[in-house]
Each structure stands twice: as structure tokens, then as C-alpha cells.
A protein has these predicted regions:
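Membrane topogenic helices and adjacent juxtamembrane segments
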Residues: 1-19, 146-154, 221-233
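Alpha-helical membrane segments and adjacent membrane-interface helices in multi-pass membrane proteins
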Residues: 31-89, 296-299
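Hydrophobic, aromatic-enriched interface-forming segments
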Residues: 148-205
Length: 315
């Protein structure tokens, strides 16, 4: 009886998955939302029945995707199903929401790397080159318009953009990581919104103000900073490693800085509007980002929160 229930539930969830997949492939705009929701059937089934049952669902979903007849369908199925099963397994084990987010990001990243390699090896398509060519054409069109309007500095601006464009191939690892994180984050938001209504037990997301990155990141940041001062030759492996790690670590330090600002405002009972305004302003005022990043570094290295909390309790 229990086995029959599992099969029936699996069939129903596969039906929902195929519907979501078809909407993703053929319905504009709404397809973006259904694309992010593709993980949901796998999360629900695995959270209720375990990862072994989830693997069977991956296999069947893959076969059905092939039967649909589109390589894109299979390319969408593999990341969604594998990430969904991992998320469902961690939910079943009452995993922390940050752990679930990190695991989903890792699974999506592996899938994106695999897709990139397959595209180059089997189809001779380099997505970076395609993207660069599209951007280059857009820049040239903008230059032509600016020149026709009498903009004298158009060529200088285009030269700067062309130089920046050359770094996109070096930053491929960073782009893959950030894309994987964004995909995992929004998929998780949609998933948890739905599964709560299906009475699947999930742990709440810890407040952003409680985010505390490991202290070891400071050592990595220091090592990367020293390596960047050594100015490795452009195009070398060391150059790519330093460039990507610098970007990712600076981003993490900035996030830690924002977290501290939210924490400080919470402890001091300052309106949430203040930290939210700072986040918005940081996208508009570049020097503000440097200050927030420095706050993040100090927060990790010198345990600012403990000092503030101690002073607050002493009052």
C-alpha cells in the first residue's frame, strides 16, 4: 500500500514537472517563473520519500524530457532534478537554510560547468564568445549613434568598454558561481513558498543580520591581496585565479558589511529603512561600497558584534 502511494505521488509530481517544463519552453515571461520552479516536484518527493526515491525520479524525468524531443528540455531537466533532490534530502534532514542554499548553488554550478564543457566539445559553441560578440555589436551600434549625434568622446568610451569586455573570459568562473547562486536563491524562495503550503516541515531562514562568514576568509583575502600586488601576467592561470578570487572575496566582504549594518540597526533599535537605504545607495555611490566592505572585514576580524552587544547589555 505504501509503495503504491509512493508511485502514485511520483507520477503526479512528474506530471506537474512536465507541465512546468512545457511552460518554461513555450510560454514567454511566465516561463521564467516556471523555470525557477522546476525543482519543486523533486524537492517535495525527496523530502517525503528519501534521496533514493528521488534518484529514480531524476531518471524518469530525464527519459520523459528526451521523449519531448528537445535537447533544451533535457538540459533544463538535469540541473533542476539533481538540485531538487539535494535540497529535498537536506530538508528531510532538517538542514539549515544556508546549508541548503549552499548545496543547491554547488549542484547548479557543477551542472553549468558540465553544460559549458559539453557545448564546446560536442557543439563547438563557446557561450562566452557568443556573449562577447553580441556585446561588441551593441557597442559598435552605440558608437555609430553617438558619433552621428556629435559626441566627441565616443571612441574613447568605446575603447574602455572594449578593454573591459576582454576580461569577461577571465571572469567566467565568477560568472558561473554568481549565476548558480542567483538560480539557487530564487529557486529556493519559490520552493519554500510552495512546500510550506503542502505541509512539508522546513526550517525558517535565519535573519540576514545573523550572517557571519568564517574568519578563515580573511586569510584567503590577505593571500589573494598579496598575489594581486605581485601583478601576475595577464592570461596566465595565476592571473585568472587571483582575478576571480578577488572578485568573489570582495563581494563576500561587502555582504558581511551589509549584514553588520542590519545587525547594528537591530541592536540599536534603528528603523529598517536606514540599512535598506544604504543598500540602495551603495549601488549608486561606488565609494560607499568600499566603506561597507571595510566594515565587513573588521566585523569578521575583530568581532565587532560581540563588542557592541557587550556595551548594549552594560547599559
Amino acid at each position: 500500500m505504501k509503495e503504491t502511494k509512493h508511485i502514485t505521488e511520483g507520477a503526479a509530481l512528474l506530471g506537474i514537472y512536465i507541465l512546468l517544463l512545457l511552460m518554461t519552453l513555450f510560454v514567454p515571461f511566465i516561463g521564467l517563473i516556471t523555470f525557477l520552479a522546476l525543482v519543486v516536484p523533486f524537492v517535495v518527493y525527496t523530502a517525503r520519500n528519501g534521496w533514493k526515491s528521488g534518484i529514480w525520479l531524476i531518471v524518469v524525468a530525464g527519459v520523459l524530457s528526451v521523449l519531448i524531443g528537445s535537447p533544451v528540455a533535457l538540459a533544463l531537466s538535469i540541473p533542476a532534478s539533481t538540485a531538487g533532490v539535494v535540497m529535498g534530502h537536506l530538508i528531510q534532514k532538517n538542514g539549515n537554510r544556508y546549508a541548503i542554499l549552499g548545496a543547491a548553488t554547488g549542484v547548479f554550478l557543477l551542472n553549468y560547468i558540465l553544460a559549458y564543457v559539453v557545448a564546446i566539445v560536442l557543439f563547438n559553441i563557446d557561450f562566452i564568445e557568443v556573449m562577447q560578440e553580441m556585446i561588441r555589436e551593441s557597442i559598435q551600434a552605440s558608437e555609430a549613434i553617438a558619433t552621428s549625434l556629435g559626441q566627441e568622446n565616443a571612441k574613447e568610451a568605446v575603447a574602455v568598454l572594449e578593454e573591459s569586455l576582454g576580461y569577461t573570459s577571465y571572469l567566467l568562473p565568477t560568472m558561473l558561481v554568481l549565476t548558480s547562486f542567483v538560480h539557487a536563491y530564487f529557486s529556493q524562495l519559490i520552493t519554500f513558498f510552495i512546500i510550506k503550503r503542502l505541509k512539508v516541515k522546513v526550517s525558517p531562514f535565519p535573519p540576514f543580520r545573523e550572517l557571519m562568514l568564517p574568519k578563515s576568509l580573511l586569510w584567503y583575502y590577505l593571500i589573494v591581496l598579496i598575489l594581486s600586488i605581485m601583478a601576475p601576467e595577464e592570461g596566465t592561470t595565476l592571473f585568472m585565479v587571483v582575478l576571480n578570487l578577488s572578485f568573489i572575496l570582495m563581494l563576500l566582504m561587502t555582504v558581511q558589511g551589509f549584514s553588520f549594518i542590519f545587525y547594528f540597526c537591530y541592536i540599536k533599535k534603528i528603523s529598517k529603512a536606514i540599512p535598506i537605504t544604504l543598500v540602495i545607495l551603495s549601488f549608486l555611490i561606488t565609494p560607499l561600497v568600499y566603506i561597507i566592505r571595510m566594515i565587513g572585514i573588521i566585523d569578521i576580524g575583530f568581532q565587532l558584534r560581540d563588542r557592541i552587544q557587550g556595551k548594549n547589555q552594560g547599559k
